[in-house]
Amino acid sequence: MNKFKLIVTTPERVLISGEVSRVLCKNAVGEFEILAGHQPYLTATVPTVTRIDDENGESKYLFTSTGLMKVQNNEVTFCVNSAEWPEEIDEARAMNAKQRAEERLKNKTDELDKKRAKLALARAMSRLKLKEM
């Protein structure tokens, strides 16, 4: 199976740095897939559950937040604001964040507040989705 190097990093730590066979992620346009030999590509990511298939084809799942993803020379680098493995997610905290975001969306009329609340809701929903997997 063809493989490539994947690095997922946040301002605090590196979550993964190793060989993988596939990455499935999401940007503002929709879901996309990266395989070995992918053309150079740069995109902004949105909060989602990112699927990582290791070199044996086994899948791992990771919450990735907003950030950038770069593909170049058979290497994929995620620089995201936050990322968590399923066992690191605090489900109660994510539920509280979801409820706060939904309340903010109901009560705020300011566009900036709406955008922030939608982003917070997307982060919370992605974390909860991953926790349920």
Swiss-Prot record:
Source domain of life: Bacteria
Keyword flag Cell membrane: yes
GO molecular function, one term: proton-transporting ATP synthase activity, rotational mechanism
Gene transcribed to yield this protein: atpC
HAMAP family tied to this protein: ATP_synth_epsil_bac
Protein's cellular compartments: Cell membrane
Summary of subunit composition and partner proteins: F-type ATPases have 2 components, CF(1) - the catalytic core - and CF(0) - the membrane proton channel. CF(1) has five subunits: alpha(3), beta(3), gamma(1), delta(1), epsilon(1). CF(0) has three main subunits: a, b and c.
Function recorded in the entry: Produces ATP from ADP in the presence of a proton gradient across the membrane.
Predominant place of localization: membrane
Protein's recorded name: ATP synthase epsilon chain
Family: Belongs to the ATPase epsilon chain family.
Keyword Membrane assigned: yes
Keywords from the named record: ATP synthesis, Cell membrane, CF(1), Hydrogen ion transport, Ion transport, Membrane, Transport
One GO CC term, this protein: plasma membrane
One Pfam family from the record: ATP-synt_DE
Membrane topology listed for this record: Peripheral membrane protein
